[in-house]
Amino acid sequence: MRPLLLSIVAIALCACHAAPEEQSVKPGINTNFLDPNLEVDKYVERFETESREVFAKRTGIARAIGLEPGMAIADVGAGTGLFVDFFARDVTAAGRVYAVELSPKFVENLRARAARRNQPMVEVVQCTERDVSLPAASVDAVFTCDTYHHFEYPAATLASIRRALRPGGALVVVDFERIPGQTRDWLMKHVRCGKEQVIREVLAAGFTLEEEVPLGFEENYFLRFRR
């Protein structure tokens, strides 16, 4: 058999045995955030209020990440920018904060916000449903807060996060507990999986679990993984 034909056969065989593309774990979970008429101010009122646990504990959460001047961090699912100011302060002008967002309206707001606050270290990134859209080995840490349960394609998204992290980099996941009989009904319906499943998925993506940081949460948890 000629070399060219052998190559074609080999390619065809590989294609036949290629892994199927990951299916959505919860179709439509991000539809509201993709609305071109999304009203950002309403989400600011909803996300940035003392009645939201992660807002009330925002200072402790930011401190627990352990950022230092000159480091680079990606806030995946940056939303209204709740943690961006903390990260910009901690990494200083010598560092970099990537505010990563799927929602076009949040992206627009984050860019205007960084300009108003004179934060040249903040770079806003429009991501996709499968990829955080960051350069390889570009960050020391990736942070997600009440965002992991919005990963519609978690395996693909985690693979892109792992590519973006430098060796030894940290992935911090802050998200809702999902405990039958304890978690509020709306969270049981909204959040697709509990902490144990999140850990399984992140470990399967090639990370190691370093610790769960106790911050006095009632509805959330803080997990630190390493690349």
Model-identified regions with their sequence ranges:
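C-terminal motif of bacterial Sec signal peptides marking the signal peptidase cleavage site
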Residues: 13-15
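Class I SAM-dependent transferase core
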Residues: 17-74
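Hydrophobic beta-strand segment of the Class I
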Residues: 73, 142-143
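Class I SAM-dependent methyltransferase SAM/SAH-binding core
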Residues: 74, 78-131
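A short acidic, Gly/Pro-enriched loop at the edge of an enzyme's catalytic core
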Residues: 132-141
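A short glycine-rich, Lys/Arg-flanked "PGG" loop and its adjoining helix->strand segment in the class I
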Residues: 155-170
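Conserved class I S-adenosyl-L-methionine
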Residues: 172-197
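Core SAM-dependent methyltransferase catalytic element
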Residues: 211-227
